[in-house]
Amino acid sequence: MGLTPMMRQYMEIKENYKDCILFFRLGDFYEMFFDDAKIAAAELELVLTARECGLKEKAPMCGIPYHAAKSYIGRMVNKGYKIAICEQLEDPAQSKGIVKRGIIKVITPGTYMDSYFLDENENNYIMCLYINNNEGSNCALCFADISTGEFNCTDTPFNLSVILDEICKFNPREIIIQEDIDSNILQGIVEVFNETFSRVDECYFQKGEEVLREQFKDLNLREYTPEIIKCGGALVKYIKHTQKTNLSHINKFQYYNIVDYLTIDINSKRNLEIVESLRESKKKGSLLGVIDKTNTSMGGRQLRKWIEQPLIDRNKIMERLDSVEEILNNICYHEDLKEALKNIYDIERLAGKISSKSVNAKELNSLKSSIEKIPDIKVILSNFETSLLKNMYKNLDELKDIYMLLDKAILDNPSVSLKEGNLIKEGYDSEIDRLKEAKVKGKDWIASLESSERELTKIKSLKIGYNKVFGYYIEVTKSNLNLVPEHRYIRKQTLSNAERYITPELKEMEDKILGAEEKLIYLEYNAFVEVRDKVEKEVTRIQNSARIISEVDCLTSLARAALENNYCKPEITLSDRVYIEEGRHPVVENMLSTGEFVSNDTDIDTGENQLLLITGPNMAGKSTYMRQVALVTIMAQIGSFVPAKSASISICDKIFTRIGASDDLASGKSTFMVEMWEVSNILKNATNKSLILLDEVGRGTSTYDGLSIAWSVIEYICRESKLRCKTLFATHYHELTKLEGKIKGVKNYCVSVKEVENNIVFLRKIIRGGADQSYGIEVAKLAGLPEEVLKRAREILNSLETEKTEESMEGTNLPKKKKEEKTSSQGEQLKFLDIEKENLINEIRDIDILNMTPMEGFNKLYDIIKKVKSI
């Protein structure tokens, strides 16, 4: 037995789309077969059935109505699946044999354009990564959002950390990679990003110049590296392959240099809760959640980009700050802008729908009503004097011609469907007007006929109706059948309580009305397409106006946040000093009642105040303080006012954090190993213009090991000539406070604590000097540990504090509980340990530390620590 002709057609199409769920159109349904059916039935909670396919066993099958496909497709795509839409390409009634079918679109997580399933305040990026294995290790990354037309490219010498940081910045839903990508590189990406990966053949990376020139007119490819051309070309090819159409709104090839923006690595972005909270992964509880007061979807997405890519160009930062200040100082214009922006729809994504020819008449009206507000925005902008706002006023296109076209052509309340008519206004097309009049007159004639037939037949309940199957009919209830004029009425349909008839004159008018309606629908559709195509030719103008509006919205949002939260305008300096007077954590402050947050000063540079060594108990506020310094810096560099009484910020190129501890069990890495890798990454990649936050370095191992590592890291940061960057270093190792005065740049600070009736009160104030004790047991008491545990902890602490601080851990004798006896084997164990210790000491003595890199040093240290733990 062989496959049936229809199933053979299915298998031939499926062969070319193996990585997709194939939605195969059969009549009014999309059907799925075999493994696709099993997957879809499970994911969409559909009934799994079977169908004869010509084989011994039936083919598993499930299906969905084609008119409800949108919601099912959205659910599958959001789960990471790709959907290939296979349509009937000819009328089944007219075809001979198997209906011709073909793929009209492939919908993937990175190419989905349905606004119902997209987050309006977040871009839906698809990314392509290309690594050149032949010429060194250069690579290129390209990111596109086909819902808005955005297309960004960059290149860099290969560095997995840099690649991961860029991916994290754009957060793509789908990543296109080479078929032969190095498995270790892929594993490194997969460990961090659990997104859809699409492997493509090498042919996608060929003829990139030709592909890019066709998509981006007047693009000078000589400005770009071969890696960018291959990467960008592959991404355009993939988009065209899946969308099966040219997308004119993807028209701006935007190159950016990674070093033109403040780099915030993955760990820092997460620890600082920049765009989402650490606990719930939501906007609320993040920096973005505090300062996002935007009124449009476009503005929300733009502000997110600003936060992901803070500036390092002082002039650009000052342009934004000056604009925010001017908006803030003109409260009336501020409110007027807010009101005008509130009524603007998502112009960027509407332009994308126009370009992809998926826009409907109601959405064109949304564009029209948005354009209607642009003159109001332009009038408000004319009142400002700062250079950025003046340029926005100058370049904002009011799009009056597009508004006039849409206002003249599209009905105020049109049909959603383009195949039902009711789209075009009276006066736009004379033939459409004539047919509409004929349609109205025909229906008036029907109403008149109904009235006259009631008169003639004396049947008061007689009525004329219509349905798509039988057309127009005269309906008479069975109780009145004796009054029917059988010589004129022709029976059409019998119902349980009525009969339906037609007459020759009714049939004649039906042909006229339906003919007019069919032609009217056809003409209205064509007129709509004509209008849409005219608007599509102006997509670039629409996008430029949308971009300006989104940036105005961002500046207005930052002004609103500054007003509501009492922020100050920071001074942006070219020095190496950061001075913050009465600084506050923007997110924590936002969660407390007004006035509850305790502000703190910060004075840090690359000279005498290079490394602030912060001691104090847990829960006292060390981490909050360190994070607020980083967040104030980020806010200043996006052009925002900052939570402080005053602030002078030197421009930072990178921010690194080592905060918190967690095992990476999936990769077999302990807390300490993860910590050491992160510290190593910081020391290798930081520059003298970076800001480093280190919290409890060394806590993942034994006390003296951790102390030694922390001490060594401080020395390296302060003494390495290429580093010497601004650093906040929180620690429990009070011994480190001795470094002030011994290592240039180290300054001791602590969190003040007050004891009241044997209880501690955290004052949250950062003051000069080191902490005299850690208050760890008091914190444990606050956490509710049993009194027996606390009592025993105090006994041990008192014993430890009486011993010499120089004494090694091996020689420390912890106090034993009462009635506890020593084991008889301890003496023998100590003799064996002495030999092991001697060997380890000799190994350490032979280490040539001056000829080791930081990473080699950490690896050697890790080996030593493992040996110590085994002794």
Curated annotation (Swiss-Prot):
Gene3D superfamilies: 1.10.1420.10, DNA repair protein MutS, domain I (3.40.1170.10), MutS, connector domain (3.30.420.110), P-loop containing nucleotide triphosphate hydrolases (3.40.50.300). CDD domains: ABC_MutS1. One of its GO terms (cellular component) is cytosol. This is DNA mismatch repair protein MutS. This protein is involved in the repair of mismatches in DNA. It is possible that it carries out the mismatch recognition step. This protein has a weak ATPase activity. Belongs to the DNA mismatch repair MutS family. GO terms for molecular function: ATP binding; ATP-dependent DNA damage sensor activity; damaged DNA binding; mismatched DNA binding. ATP binds at G616, P617, N618, M619, A620, G621, K622, S623. One of its GO terms (biological process) is mismatch repair. InterPro entries: DNA_mismatch_repair_MutS (IPR005748), DNA_mismatch_repair_MutS-lik_N (IPR007695), DNA_mismatch_repair_MutS/MSH (IPR017261), DNA_mismatch_repair_MutS_C (IPR000432), DNA_mismatch_repair_MutS_clamp (IPR007861), DNA_mismatch_repair_MutS_core (IPR007696), DNA_mismatch_repair_MutS_N (IPR016151), DNA_mismatch_repair_MutS_sf (IPR036187). It comes from Clostridium kluyveri (strain ATCC 8527 / DSM 555 / NBRC 12016 / NCIMB 10680 / K1). Residues 801-825 are annotated as: Disordered. Keywords: ATP-binding, DNA damage, DNA repair, DNA-binding, Nucleotide-binding. The keyword DNA repair applies.
